[in-house]
Structure formats: structure tokens, C-alpha cells
Amino acid sequence: MEYPFWVNDFDRIKNYRDSYPLSSEIFEQPQSFWYGDNPKKPKKHMEKSIRRLLNRALPQLPILVMYNIPNRDVGQYSKGGAATKERYLDYVERFTKGIGKDSPIVIYEPDALPHSTHLSEQEKEWRLQLMKESLQMLTDSCNGRFYIDVGHSNWLEPKVVAELLDKISNPKVKGFSVNSCNYRTTKECI
């Protein structure tokens, strides 16, 4: 990278370091910022939130995470996501407007790709098509550096991951990410 990942300045408001001294190492690490969709908030809220974050992070590189795929986490702990394809594509459009001409790292939909293997064949094809369509929208509409999340090191065989990536990727996607929502060690993931 030509510049370091942004480390959030949480401490400037709440003085967390003094309140939680054992956690100070955590505050010194880059953190990602997760964006889903909150129907209770005005539609422009996410766009403004992303713009504010990108402006605060300059000149460093923030990491954003998109996390709103329909049937997110296939009904497990983080279930939810957009209710319909249309709602999801609206979310994608608002996300791209938030990024604008900036180039943050964006982790695309943690666990959505490996979870597709837990769906019926029809649901799997629907999800993969939605992922392909939304990635095309994203890479055509903004300068984000997109990485498709492929789960963790103990989930799918590399051959299966490669086959799934072939179905949804496009040349503008920068690569893939691992372990975005798990607790595997770096050593396990390499």
C-alpha cells in the first residue's frame, strides 16, 4: 500500500484509553467500518456516514465492509440483510454515492459467497447472480478497491472458492479477503 490503513480516533471523544487501559492495543489497530441498511434511518444517512468517515481518514486508507446481502448469514447469528433484490441494489447505489471519487478498501459481503453453498440450487444461483450484478454496479460507479470475502480457512476447499469466484467476479475486483467475520489466526489463514 502506498499509505497506511486508518486507525480510528475513538479516543478523542470518550477517553477510552484511560477508562480501559488493558484495551489500548486494540485502539492502536486499524478497524473496519461495517455498513448494512437501517430502514429506520433516512436513505441519505449511510451516504453521509461514509463521506464523513472518508474525510476524517484522509490521507490514510479506511477499510469499509458491505454487509446487507438478502438472507444474510442464512438465518444464523447475524441474520438479516435487505428484504428484496431491489432494496439491496438501492443500498449498493447509495454505498457507491458515499464513496464517490475516493478509493477505500471495501470488503464485499462477508460470508455471502461461502454461505451460498448452504442454499438450495435455485437460491444459490439467485444469490450469485445478485452478487455479480451488484459488483458490476460497484466497480462501474465508484473507485473503491473491492475484495470479495470468501469466509475462513476451514470452510471451503480452495477449488470450490475458485469456482464460486469465477461465477461472480469481474476484472475490476482487486482480489479476495479471508476471515472477515471469524476468529482464525493469521497463521491458519495463510
PLM features: what roles do these ranges have?
Residues 32-33, 59-65, 103-107, 143-147, ...:
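Structural preference for beta-strand elements that scaffold enzyme active sites
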Residues 72-76, 114-118, 155-159, 184-188:
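Extracytoplasmic/secreted cell-surface and envelope-processing proteins
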Residues 89-103, 163-176:
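Structural recognition of alpha->loop->beta junctions
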Residues 119-120, 124-134, 156-169, 188-190:
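Distinct, well-ordered alpha-helical segments
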Residues 134-145:
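A non-catalytic structural micro-motif
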Residues 171-190:
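Catalytic alpha/beta core domains of metabolic enzymes, predominantly
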